[in-house]
Amino acid sequence: MNDSKDAPKSYDFDLIIIGGGSGGLAAAKEAAKFDKKVMVLDFVTPTPLGTRWGLGGTCVNVGCIPKKLMHQAALLGQALKDSRNYGWKLEDTVKHDWEKMTESVQNHIGSLNWGYRVALREKKVVYENAYGKFIGPHKIMATNNKGKEKVYSAERFLIATGERPRYLGIPGDKEYCISSDDLFSLPYCPGKTLVVGASYVALECAGFLAGIGLDVTVMVRSILLRGFDQDMANKIGEHMEEHGIKFIRQFVPTKIEQIEAGTPGRLKVTAKSTNSEETIEDEFNTVLLAVGRDSCTRTIGLETVGVKINEKTGKIPVTDEEQTNVPYIYAIGDILEGKLELTPVAIQAGRLLAQRLYGGSTVKCDYDNVPTTVFTPLEYGCCGLSEEKAVEKFGEENIEVYHSFFWPLEWTVPSRDNNKCYAKVICNLKDNERVVGFHVLGPNAGEVTQGFAAALKCGLTKQQLDSTIGIHPVCAEIFTTLSVTKRSGGDILQSGCUG
């Protein structure tokens, strides 16, 4: 497509950002520091149930923030149980109040939404709650929720539209099921819940719902946590099952029917085996779909301006400077092909892009060795390669895996979950036993992983880990004493906190 044809002679803005999520807002605020005229277009298409939210994108409204807060609610429930062993006397049976939790979480989210609005205003970034769609070179149509249309032009555009939950395309899914977009503001307790999917979203939601006392079943098509280390994924699944979460494996729903309307009501789920003709039926109050997410790229006019997308996935291929095949259009965040779908990655990419475009910087976003955490009941933190990827990249004979179970001191008094927490480092034997994969399953896994991620960036070796003196008695010290290799088949069970 010829960019100059029909392009305006002058522009309304230096940069228009489509999407007011973490990445888009980070880029907007950074570009504004260089006295650039910046606009953010953000519009939330309501879910099939009508749920919508404010400025800030998935993470703040229907992702990391409410998820972590509800995970904390579940952890507090466990802490209350443990407290009896520490001398606390709880006279009454402790009950959980769903409505109070969601009200508190939504109040916090509302304060964040407002904070983003204020921050944009202070930085003189123009914000419009409108749906952006390209209509020609350097031109975009913004449509608000009343259908009013305005056309704006810009020298450059940044696509940061993110993703939304996928539906199954079966009878009753959009009519009767909820997604993570609905769950965190659900005005009633979901009751007996079926979670469909095995993504980190599915397992995190199943975990905190069970943690606050609900009857939870997870329906899994194939494997847990695809793309993550499968040794760790299976340990997570085992722990969840031991704590009362039921798993229906190798089944997919084929039909959702309403038996009784209400809040929550009753639903009948019919499911079919993925490897036989067997079908099953069961009743649930709520069905939560967490079967993946689709990029919001197909209805924003990209074909009009010639931006190429992966037709199968909707993802946008970009250069190492986040530039699409159309030179004046850039993209960041979850919509990028082959990149990690994580909030801090989008924020980093957005900031660095603005610094390169307007501040003379040459620093690019480093997508390697990015740490992340799955907030399942037993948290999983990781950085670098999974065991499978390490074998694929270096060969099984060229890696050494050091591992051990461990027992957090705080859990010894209530005497629970011994030899469930697990630590593993994967080393490249051909490169001075450099650590290429870091994995931890246990409490505060994110806090443990963050510091080690910096060490991995600096080229951490096993010898350096061994020469580091641990802090006692904490979970992270296990990484300074790992001595048993998987190859050896040696015993990795722990009998106490000092052994």
Curated annotation (Swiss-Prot):
PROSITE patterns: PYRIDINE_REDOX_1. The modification Phosphotyrosine is found at residue 131. Binds 1 FAD per subunit. ISGylated. Keywords: Cytoplasm, Disulfide bond, FAD, Flavoprotein, NADP, Oxidoreductase, Phosphoprotein, Redox-active center, Selenocysteine, Ubl conjugation. The modification N6-succinyllysine is found at residue 68. The active site is at residue 472. There is a cross-link at residues 497-498 (Cysteinyl-selenocysteine (Cys-Sec)). GO terms for biological process: benzene-containing compound metabolic process; cell population proliferation; cell redox homeostasis; cellular response to copper ion; cellular response to hyperoxia; gastrulation; halogen metabolic process; hydrogen peroxide catabolic process. InterPro entries: FAD/NAD-bd_sf, FAD/NAD-binding_dom, FAD/NAD-linked_Rdtase_dimer_sf, GSHR/TRXR-like, Pyr_nuc-diS_OxRdtase, Pyr_nucl-diS_OxRdtase_dimer, Pyr_OxRdtase_I_AS, Thioredoxin/glutathione_Rdtase. Changing residue 498 to S: Loss of activity. Coiled coil: none annotated. It holds the Pfam family Pyr_redox_dim. Its cofactor is FAD. Belongs to the class-I pyridine nucleotide-disulfide oxidoreductase family. This is Thioredoxin reductase 1, cytoplasmic. It comes from Rattus norvegicus. The gene is Txnrd1.
